[in-house]
A protein has these predicted regions:
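Short cysteine-rich clusters marking metal-coordination/redox-active sites
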Residues: 8-11, 26-29
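Bacterial signal peptide processing site
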Residues: 83-85
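Short, non-ligating residues that shape and space the ligands of small metal-coordination modules
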Residues: 17-18, 33-36
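Short, intrinsically disordered terminal segments enriched in charged and Pro/Gly residues
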Residues: 40-65
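Functional cores of ribonucleases/endoribonucleases
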Residues: 141-205
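Bacterial Sec-type N-terminal signal peptides, specifically the leucine/valine-rich hydrophobic h-region
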Residues: 76-79
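Residues immediately within or flanking Cys/His clusters that coordinate Zn2+
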Residues: 5-6, 23
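Compact soluble domain cores
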Residues: 96-167
Length: 205
């Protein structure tokens, strides 16, 4: 993986610490940094249910709706004498909400990571974001339960395993349960989900 900082290709507002292929989830638009989808914007079946191009369209439509509402509210405030409405005010309000949403995500406290052979996410923030995106849909009742299951995939002797040639990350896949896990070169879980494309997604790594 490219270790340089990487601008989210969906919202173009958040910068991943590294990428593409970090599997970090953008706190602004919720796009997960999937290298295959970054390189093939129309590809479905990876870490994101929608293709990158579909995610971009969805984000832009939501942002446009929000800006329309913000302008409307600002206009009402101006009519009521609470202040003057302007396009710059609306844009400032929109950016403030996006910033607040980003900060609320990043202020989650960091948990202590264990150095045993039980694999974990790098910190609580990453665990929580992946649990919210994938774990609940997979039926797990808690983030810790989701993390424990991801670790079990890595240690499962029946799991398919390969090392990514470009970045050295370890990729694990259990075909019978359609479970996919990536572990970083320093031993932390990057992501865990059920790819819609199944083993075809694993084979593309």
């Amino acid at each position: 993986m490219n270790k340089k900082k990487y601008l989210c290709p969906c919202c173009k507002k958040y910068v991943f610490a590294e990428g593409p292929g970090s599997y970090e989830i953008c706190p602004v638009c919720s796009w997960e940094d999937d290298k295959i989808q970054a390189e093939n914007p129309d590809y479905k079946g990876g870490a994101n249910k929608l293709s990158l191009n579909e995610c971009i369209k969805k984000f832009n439509s939501v942002l446009a709706l929000f800006l329309t509402i913000a302008v409307f509210i600002a206009g009402l405030a101006g009519l009521s004498g609470c202040g003057t409405a302007s396009g710059s005010t609306a844009n400032t309000s929109a950016n403030a909400v996006i910033t607040d949403a980003q900060e609320s995500t990043t202020k989650v406290s960091t948990s202590d990571n264990t150095q045993t052979r039980t694999y974990t996410f790098r910190n609580q923030k990453l665990l929580n974001s992946h649990y919210e995106k994938h774990g609940k849909d997979m039926g797990f009742s808690s983030a810790k339960e989701y993390e424990k299951a991801a670790s079990a995939v890595v240690t499962n002797p029946d799991a398919l395993h390969k090392t990514e040639a470009e970045d050295g990350d370890d990729v694990y896949y259990v075909e019978s349960t359609n479970e996919f896990v990536i572990v970083s070169t320093d031993g932390y879980i990057r992501t865990y989900f059920n790819p819609d494309a199944g083993i075809a997604y694993y084979n593309r790594q």
